[in-house]
């Protein structure tokens, strides 16, 4: 009778299983050892999770596929930074290829900072074109945050190296002469918008980290310009910086004091 492989050896040998129908799982199921049964459950859980992630990713390509089938380029557009008291609103436009294959690309808010940082260069490498559009604090104060976001999105679209035939936008209408699909929570429904949300978020986070070095004491690297206790204390102690939005209430109160 042949000796059973050790559990450590089994774990190593079965690490490459990528399909629930793999015949090796049947052999593992027949192994009565408690550790083998635990390993079976772990593998089944991993594969089920991966399959669910793949199905969700394919669902996020639903809006792009009809246009790709006609050979049209689709740009996803999203923004980050509408709510902070400091820093610009940053938008991104991303044109993905029809063979785009990074299943983890999802709404940036559902990803950790580490995951976003890992996905950022992968998106840049696979995308056909990527552009950033910025609405400065001065522009926000001049025309309000909603209109500044629209202008920033317009800049992102016009900055693309390739002309898109279709836009998928997260809940806004952009002033450009290109057909648009407006999606509520588009960053969770469209891979193109999700990619744009990640690019915009990582870009803005890096920018705010730079501002943190220029204007220490507000916690910009940690709070990204949002009105945290540290940020509000910095405003009270140090006053308003050139990157603060002067029409936003807490900043306005400091200026009027």
From Swiss-Prot:
Subcellular location: Cytoplasm
Residues that hold a divalent metal cation according to the record: 78-79, 170
Bound cofactor: record note: Manganese or magnesium. Binds 1 divalent metal ion per monomer in the absence of substrate. May bind a second metal ion after substrate binding.
Class of enzymatic activity (EC top level): hydrolase
Presence of keyword Transcription regulation: no
A single Gene Ontology CC term: cytoplasm
Record InterPro entries: RNase_HII, RNase_HII/HIII, RNase_HII/HIII_dom, RNaseH-like_sf, RNaseH_sf
Family: Belongs to the RNase HII family.
Record's function text: Endonuclease that specifically degrades the RNA of RNA-DNA hybrids.
Name the UniProt record assigns to this protein: Ribonuclease HII
Source species of the chain: Levilactobacillus brevis (strain ATCC 367 / BCRC 12310 / CIP 105137 / JCM 1170 / LMG 11437 / NCIMB 947 / NCTC 947)
């Amino acid at each position: 009778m042949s000796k059973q492989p050790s559990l450590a050896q089994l774990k190593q040998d079965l690490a490459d299983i990528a399909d629930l129908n793999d015949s090796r799982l049947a052999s593992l199921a027949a192994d009565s050892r408690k550790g083998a049964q635990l390993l079976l459950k772990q593998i089944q859980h991993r594969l089920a999770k991966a399959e669910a992630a793949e199905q969700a990713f394919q669902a996020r390509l639903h809006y792009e596929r009809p246009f790709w089938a006609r050979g049209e380029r689709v740009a996803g557009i999203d923004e980050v930074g509408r709510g902070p008291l400091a820093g610009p609103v940053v938008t991104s436009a991303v044109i993905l290829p029809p063979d785009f294959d990074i299943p983890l690309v999802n709404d940036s808010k559902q990803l950790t900072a580490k995951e976003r940082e890992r996905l950022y260069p992968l998106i840049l490498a696979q995308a056909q074109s990527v552009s950033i559009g910025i609405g400065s604090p001065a522009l926000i104060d001049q025309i309000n945050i909603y209109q500044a976001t629209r202008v920033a999105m317009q800049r992102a679209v016009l900055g693309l190296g390739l002309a898109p035939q279709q836009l998928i936008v997260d809940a806004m209408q952009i002033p450009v002469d290109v057909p648009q699909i407006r999606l509520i929570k588009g960053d969770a429904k469209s891979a193109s918008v999700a990619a744009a949300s990640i690019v915009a978020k990582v870009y803005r986070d890096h920018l705010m980290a730079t501002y943190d070095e220029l204007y220490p004491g507000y916690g910009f690297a940690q709070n990204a310009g949002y009105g945290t206790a540290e940020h509000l204390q910095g405003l009270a102690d140090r006053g308003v910086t050139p990157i603060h939005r002067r029409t936003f209430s807490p900043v306005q109160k400091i200026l009027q004091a």
